């Protein structure tokens, strides 16, 4: 099972979602920013690293929002989703097709990766 972390980044009543690049698995679907936990990292350290690599931001990682195990055809992931806020930086599309800030009632307008639903 692959350990994965993601950030539910809140700002002014909205949260950030990111669109995966077309060339990657589950391309053009939306997700919460994050990635795989390396063996030497805590989940929080992995989330901070992934957000620096993918968005050029530093996070303030909060409490766990949700834990889920999802089986894709090609892998099984244990996803830990953390509440978070941006400490420094402005999100950049370094590894994503698009970034959106949405309200909770807008979530159904976006096609998400199944583990992020």
Task: Give, region by region, the residue ranges found by the protein language model.
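Conserved N-terminal beta-strand and adjoining loop/helix that marks the start
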Residues: 1-16, 36
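Conserved Nudix-box catalytic region and its N-terminal flanking loop in Nudix hydrolases
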Residues: 14-53
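Hydrophobic packing within well-folded, soluble alpha/beta domains
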Residues: 47-52, 64, 82, 99, ...
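NUDIX/MutT-family hydrolases
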Residues: 83, 92-117
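Active-site-adjacent beta-strand/loop module that shapes the phosphate/pyrophosphate-binding cleft
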Residues: 67-90, 100
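Short secondary-structure junctions
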Residues: 54-61
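Conserved hydrophobic "DFG−1" position in protein kinase catalytic cores
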Residues: 9-10, 17, 86, 101
